[in-house]
Amino acid sequence: MENLTLSIVTPYGSIYNGEVKYVVIPGSEGEFGVFPGHCNLLSLLKVGVIEFENLEGNKGLVAINWGHAQISDTDVNIIADGAVAIAGNTESEIVAAISDAKTLLKEASDDSALFGMVVSRVESDYKNFIK
């Protein structure tokens, strides 16, 4: 099976660059999934969480405030204004990343329902990221 190359960058640098099995992206018209072989697409991105699975089967989450995605059959390139990877080697590092993500998301959206939904999703999955 072919894989995707996922690149997530901000004006401050690279957040993630690697091979993945799939990506779920918060598009401006709703979330959508990308698998290898996807058609070419450009999409605006809204406040939300990018979810992906790397080749080892580990799930990754990256909170973004807004941006855009360029998708081809083998690549997903995301440029976000702001992004926080929910990752770390210890629970305290992950809790700090979640706190940073909450701050980013809160500043990006006045929609309290959307904010609550995204934060709830991040918090419910955080234990999956402790290595």
Curated annotation (Swiss-Prot):
InterPro entries: ATP_synth_F1_dsu/esu, ATP_synth_F1_dsu/esu_N, ATPsynth_dsu/esu_N. Produces ATP from ADP in the presence of a proton gradient across the membrane. It comes from the Bacteria. Gene3D superfamilies: F0F1 ATP synthase delta/epsilon subunit, N-terminal. It is a peripheral membrane protein. F-type ATPases have 2 components, CF(1) - the catalytic core - and CF(0) - the membrane proton channel. CF(1) has five subunits: alpha(3), beta(3), gamma(1), delta(1), epsilon(1). CF(0) has three main subunits: a, b and c. GO terms for cellular component: plasma membrane; proton-transporting ATP synthase complex. Keywords: ATP synthesis, Cell inner membrane, Cell membrane, CF(1), Hydrogen ion transport, Ion transport, Membrane, Transport. Signal peptide: none annotated. The keyword Cell membrane applies. This is ATP synthase epsilon chain. One of its GO terms (molecular function) is proton-transporting ATP synthase activity, rotational mechanism. It is found in: Cell inner membrane. Belongs to the ATPase epsilon chain family. SUPFAM superfamilies: Epsilon subunit of F1F0-ATP synthase N-terminal domain (SSF51344).
